[in-house]
């Protein structure tokens, strides 16, 4: 990295929807780098609950307090190739469990083979949000008391979006 070159990182995921775990990762990563790109990776084989535009809007809402964070979308590319395209020197990944670690460690080696100039940074969220996932949040919607329950796991702007979407069911 050249002197005076901004330290740019990419934090990618499906963010369907963004959770407090994602927000924790964003908060930590933005404090470590000059610029953080929060990128929605489009997986055509994965059925999403929210459109790409909705997910990007939610991410913009929950990251607006961080001037060094921007959102983006990438599709049909390896994350490491996307990182290279946006001149990021780092990929940020979250480790919630031993199985996450094993998977991410393997991916880090593959990424290093494809783009040795890009480093992977692993962050471990605190125990109280380590098990929070978008899939878990979506699974909690519906039963009696779900609105109070999911409020514990998603940022306020995301909570309001989910409530508005399901208001006809209450």
UniProtKB/Swiss-Prot annotation:
It is an enzyme of class 2 (transferase). Substrate binds at residues 14, 46, 79, 93. GO terms for cellular component: cytoplasm. Its EC number is 2.7.7.3. ATP binds at residues 14-15, 22, 94-96, 104, 129-135. Keywords: ATP-binding, Coenzyme A biosynthesis, Cytoplasm, Magnesium, Nucleotide-binding, Nucleotidyltransferase, Transferase. It comes from the Bacteria. Transmembrane segments: none annotated. GO terms for molecular function: ATP binding; pantetheine-phosphate adenylyltransferase activity. It catalyses: (R)-4'-phosphopantetheine + ATP + H(+) = 3'-dephospho-CoA + diphosphate. CDD domains: PPAT (cd02163). Pfam families: CTP_transf_like. Pathway: Cofactor biosynthesis; coenzyme A biosynthesis; CoA from (R)-pantothenate: step 4/5. InterPro entries: Cyt_trans-like (IPR004821), PPAT (IPR001980), Rossmann-like_a/b/a_fold (IPR014729). HAMAP family: PPAT_bact. Belongs to the bacterial CoaD family. Reversibly transfers an adenylyl group from ATP to 4'-phosphopantetheine, yielding dephospho-CoA (dPCoA) and pyrophosphate. Homohexamer. This is Phosphopantetheine adenylyltransferase. It comes from Neisseria meningitidis serogroup B (strain ATCC BAA-335 / MC58). The lineage of its organism: Bacteria, Pseudomonadati, Pseudomonadota, Betaproteobacteria, Neisseriales.
